[in-house]
Every structure is written in C-alpha cells, then in structure tokens.
A protein has these predicted regions:
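Conserved functional hotspots at enzyme active or ligand-binding sites that engage polyanionic ligands
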Residues: 1-112
Length: 112
C-alpha cells in the first residue's frame, strides 16, 4: 500500500463515534513506513455522509476521484492506526489535487 491510496478496510466493531466495519479509508502514512516491517498503517476514514464535507479540512471526493460507488468525504479529523492486514482491497490512488487538499486538511487538524 502507498500513501494516497483508497482501500476497503475491515475495521472492528465501532465503539462510540469511532469508525467500524467495512469502509473505505485513505492511506496517509509516509511510504517509508508503509514499506517497512511496521505492521500498522495510519489511515483517514472516508464516509458517504456528505454533511461532513462542511467540516474544516475535510475533502469531498466525487465517485470518479475516489473509485467509490457514492460521492464521499475524507474525514481528516478521524485518523486511525490499524493493522495492515485489515486493508482488504485497493480501490485506487487519488490524483495530486485531492491529495493536496487532504494534506492541507491534515496540517489544519494537526496544527503542523
């Protein structure tokens, strides 16, 4: 897996407002870590709840951009570290412009 790729993930049963079950995620971890022996990967959760597109830093993706069946939103405030084995199938890699917007959103939410 590479930074900027959208994957289907099999997340555990959700607790509270945490993400769970089968859902798309965006790999945001740097590639040297993705290519290492580290067994985990940092992802941003993707949702079809378009109301979340209004939240600061979140990025709306069209179906063609994401490869998903519905327009979706990368929720930059919902970052999760998961075991790499939970990534089940690669959907596609985002192009430069939506990834640039995601990176801006990550800088905003992480204050870096």
């Amino acid at each position: 897996m590479k930074r900027g790729e959208v994957w289907w993930a099999a997340l555990p049963v959700p607790i509270g407002s945490g993400p769970g079950l089968r859902r798309p995620v965006l790999v945001i971890q740097a590639n040297p870590f993705n290519d290492s022996r580290i067994a985990t990967v940092i992802v941003a959760v993707i949702t079809s709840n378009l109301a979340l597109a209004a939240a600061p830093g979140n990025v709306r993706l069209g179906k063609a951009e994401s490869g998903l069946p519905k327009p979706s939103v990368v929720n930059v405030s919902q970052l999760v570290t998961i075991d790499k084995s939970l990534l089940k199938s690669r959907i596609r890699a985002l192009t430069a412009e939506p990834m640039r917007l995601v990176e801006e959103g990550l800088r905003l939410v992480l204050a870096v």
